[in-house]
Amino acid sequence: MLSTNLEQTLHRALAGAKRRRHEYATLEHLLLALLEDPDAVAVFHACGMDLEQLRDDVLEYIDNELSNLITTHSGDAKPTAGFQRVLQRVAIHVQSSGREELNGANVLVAMFWEQESHAVYLLQEQDMTRLDAVNYISHGIAKVTQVIDYARRHQHPLQRTLEKE
């Protein structure tokens, strides 16, 4: 089952691609949408990401490098194979781990398997790794310590791990 936040994130990704008249929704569209997903944002902060810079970089890539996706058809944007693989990986992982709900943090981790994507390149440009994200989600270990205070102040659900300490 998808969390409400993830449902909204996927809708934003597909709607953003459609708004740009792109035939396909790519991982970059998904990454842009994850920048507004509370679960993913907590992970971004834990990994020390500069979200403003990341947003600018993703938008620059989408606007300048994906112009070949512009279509004259007015239909909905279709997820690329990479986009679909990420969602399939998340579903399999969450199901095998015994959890019931997929969220944006899970999607962010799964994106790292798409090594050839520009979305992953942009994450790595700011020194974010899959391990950084997994450490935060699974163990509450932030790459940067000030994020723990941020997450506690905002009572983010991913902080349940820290509250057990």
Label for each model-derived stretch:
Residues 1-165:
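Histone-fold recognition with a strong bias for associated Lys/Arg-rich disordered tails
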